[in-house]
């Protein structure tokens, strides 16, 4: 079951003069919305818990060259609460959600050793408007959300958990069933992030566009149990330059790019309203950011 809950990742924040290879990414946790992206749940409440682990051991330059090696890891546990209305707006089912993340991060390099780390409440994410349409062979969702800087952030600190800025989001998810029995599905999820200026630094991190996608095949295991298996991937691109005090022309021009492919499985028990999921992604050909892998484990229950 797809709880349709984009939430947000903590941002490792260092001044450019402190560590040139610690480029930021967007704040969306890539890959989490790859499966059943256009599907809206049945009316009622859903609780979802998502555990994400991102591990990166190389920093890539603007041409994809390795600038440094070390470790950048992010652990997140996100509790999401979704309400789906039984009423429709513009022919679409209306829903809303809130996501509260707890996070832990660390950054180290082979040359400099431990650089930063922090843990605690991260930035929370709210989606006051989710509209979902569906036909016999497709589903689509349109979303407005915003990221509130509730995580700890102080300019120059080495234990930040939050980003230090607000983010507004426009997103959409689509799922297309390729077969009449709906056992083969292609899904895509797009998100555009509008970032404000970072508190205490005056830095504008640049805007970001992200894409998650999947091709999944459902295998019935019993009358009340099914398994989805397939291929997943994600992409992310910085669309505008970073700007602000201390940002050089070279740093402003170095827009990050992220690519990943992997595999996933979802176990569904629809009569009980329970879903379990596992995704693994391996990144490749990244530019101006870290490169590594991601493991994501999810569970949800509908009431």
Where in this protein do the model-derived segments appear?
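Short loop/turn motifs that connect adjacent beta-strands in outer-membrane beta-barrel proteins
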Residues: 21-24, 36-44, 85-95, 133-140, ...
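Surface-exposed strand-loop-strand hairpins of Gram-negative outer-membrane beta-barrel proteins
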Residues: 24-25, 53-76, 110-120
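Outer membrane beta-barrel transmembrane domains
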Residues: 27, 201-303
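Extracellular loop and loop/strand-boundary signature of outer-membrane beta-barrel proteins
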Residues: 34, 63-69, 110-116, 154-160, ...
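Residues on the lipid-exposed face of transmembrane beta-strands in outer-membrane beta-barrel proteins
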Residues: 37, 49, 78-83, 126-132, ...
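Detector for outer-membrane/organellar transmembrane beta-barrel domains
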Residues: 143, 152-154, 158-247
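Transmembrane beta-barrel strands of outer-membrane/channel proteins
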Residues: 45-55, 96-104, 142-148, 188-194, ...
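Residues that define the transmembrane beta-barrel architecture of outer-membrane proteins
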Residues: 43, 71-79, 115-125, 162-168, ...
